[in-house]
Amino acid sequence: MKTRNKMKKLEQEKFVVPKTVQNVIPIKAVYKDGIFLVGKNMYSKTFLFTDVNYYIACENEKNDLMRQYWAVINSFGNGVTVKLTINNHRFDKEDFEKSILMPYYYDNLDVYRKEYNEMLLNKAATSECIVQDKYFTVTVNKKCYEDARAFFTRIEKNLSTNLFELGSKCEPLNATDRLKIFHNFYRAGSEENFNLDFELLQNQGCDVRDYISPDSMDFNSDYMMINGQYCRTVFLRNYGTFVDDNIITELTSINKNLMLSIDFIPIPVDEANKDVDNILLGVQSDKANFNRRQAQNLNYGATNYDLEQREKEILEIRNDMRYRDQRIYDTIISMVITADSKQELDNLTESIFAKASENSTAQFAMLRYQQLDGLNTVLPFGVKRIECYRTLTTESLASFMPFHAQEVSHPGGAYYGQNAISNNMIFVNRHSLLNGNSIVLGVPGGGKSFMVKEDIVSIFLSNPDADIVIIDPEREYNALVKAFGGEVINISANSPNHINAMDMNANYEDEGNPVTTKSEFIMSLCEQLLGTSADAKDKSIIDRCCKNVYDGYIKNNYSTQQPTLKDFREELLKQKETEAHDLALAIELFTDGSLNTFAQPTNVDINNRLISYDILELGDSLLPVGMLIVLDNLLNKITSNREKRRQTYIFIDEMYLLFAHQYTAKFLYRIWKRVRKYGAFAIGITQNVGDMLESNTARTMVSNSEFVIMLNQKASDVLELSRLLEITPNQTQYFTNKDAGQGLMKIGSNLVPFVNKFPKDTQLYKLMTSKPGEAI
């Protein structure tokens, strides 16, 4: 009680009847870094934090998360008030639709864009259209702004560290970010009008409240009107002995604008111990008095069960404080709900009260004639205006768990399905990730190729500045590529299509001499042809001959015909060393023999926006060599596109084939590491997860990929992936025994269960599906 009274005295202000809507907003001063002065020497700052996957965790994992959340709660220390806020706010549907729909380019592909846009609109209609933000707002009494700033710097460091341990990220909000929260609440429906230049306001001496306050506020006994919208604040009056850890999720799952806040004041340990001892002494005294009265009435067996239970609870609290690192908190739980009509408001209120009592025997109540005080308590200003305290331990407070499920919705991202938990749409922008390369894994029939084709469709139709190249070992993509006007390049020993293994553009190497880098590739190619590693002499000869055959080409500014493997072999024969002639003999089959398809000038159009290399008919002898040359050809494409400021997306199907050969695996790994700085992204696809992960190189590539899509997997592969990507057993259920189009995505540090279904009555579906009878 001592701390509660002290905080009340610090926050108490003389009541003045507000004359304007600006006066009801408890902001005295705003600083650029987001610190607000909300009372006499009372400063507050808000920290946004991200969600974690509590819902899909198993019981042991939930217990671990709960204990880690204890550490977050206990980290704030004494002398502060902390407000945890869950902010549900609807995004503007019209703006949202504009942001996700593909533009039309008035070409023959618009028919597909129309189908894709209709699919997106249908998904948006079934989505919750709610964004949920979570904040901690810390309020402290300090003599001046400078002292408050130093204090909040320490708080930010401690809070970030503890939330990181829990798997969450913390970000302090600046003045504009905080003011936007209040603007969007007070002026719901006009969120797009927020355009605050904080520095300009400061220079002009304007009151920031003018830019966030509503046009009107009208208060009734148990509800209020804000800009014509009905609002009501309620508070937690009581709760039973058991609190379900999903109560916060249940209360905030309503598809409406609302905020729920939990204010808690840490009680110093010595004060808490003294208070608990005094309460225990009082209960034991009442118990002794009861027993004495019963003895006087000769009723020796009588027991006051209420006092017995109360004593037991207090003893448990005392033991928790002494032996389980539990602290005591004075707590207020309040909530503001909004509606378009009084009837809807009453219905929502009734629904919330029912949810609370049903799940956790908690009792919410309406605030009577305190709606404004309740509102200012709920909103993350950092003030408390109502006296509805409950005393909770750390464990009891942590039961009001704010975490539920991770969401991913990158601005400008492509659509990848719906969150299986929240039903919200998933948008991933590879540019937002540290490394935009991705892996798609799934057994046959799991929807792997469909999901990859949908990715290709999305990129190709929406981004005219992007080129797409596919390596197709199963002739899986021909129908889609041809329908979009792309180029299918069949590569085999008997094909009339040729790719010159010696192709090299001026941008082949961004640092240093491109011939040096090309020489390394030719060494790998020769080693693949030889079937063994080249020794030091061989490498010197290869390097020398490479420089010689490229000399004239480079001197003519890369404008003459490029050398071929035949030219390279002829250069080998000119050398005096016996080893050079041995090398020439070893590669003769691939330059002048029946497998010379890569020793001739390139005669295919590689400038098309959509290219598929069909390598189905490459025989066993040509496959490893062919894969190396195709990969090198891709590197030429990527480096050339970088000069043109075009993006390149490389889709490598059945990627496990490349890891079956040492040199293709090594070259792929080199490309995988380099493509990001060239403005390109590599996407690997495979159904043979176990085979691929036998390669340490493949394991490194998968574990380092920021974007991994796991569709239905074999049991052995589930175990392997869970170890490699640190996925818990409970999370693996989302890609075990699942229907096509369902699985788990690893997006950065987020793990998101997803469902991706596409309407069957579309031309796009027929182009993307591989089901017999449905595919074109």
What do the PLM-derived regions correspond to, one by one?
Residues M451:
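Hydrophobic positions on the alpha1 helix immediately C-terminal to the Walker A/P-loop
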Residues V440:
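Hydrophobic anchor at the beta1->P-loop junction of P-loop NTPases
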Residues K448:
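Conserved lysine of the Walker
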Residues G485-I489, T697-M710:
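A short helix-turn-beta junction within AAA+ P-loop NTPase domains corresponding to the substrate/partner-engaging
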Residues M1-F403:
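Extended, folded cores of ATP/NTP-driven motor/assembly subunits in large transport
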Residues V52-N53, E59-N78, T85, H89, ...:
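P-loop NTPase motor domains
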Residues L725-I776:
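Conserved P-loop NTPase
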Residues S458-V469:
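Post-Walker A helix-loop "phosphate-sensing" segment adjacent to the P-loop in P-loop NTPases
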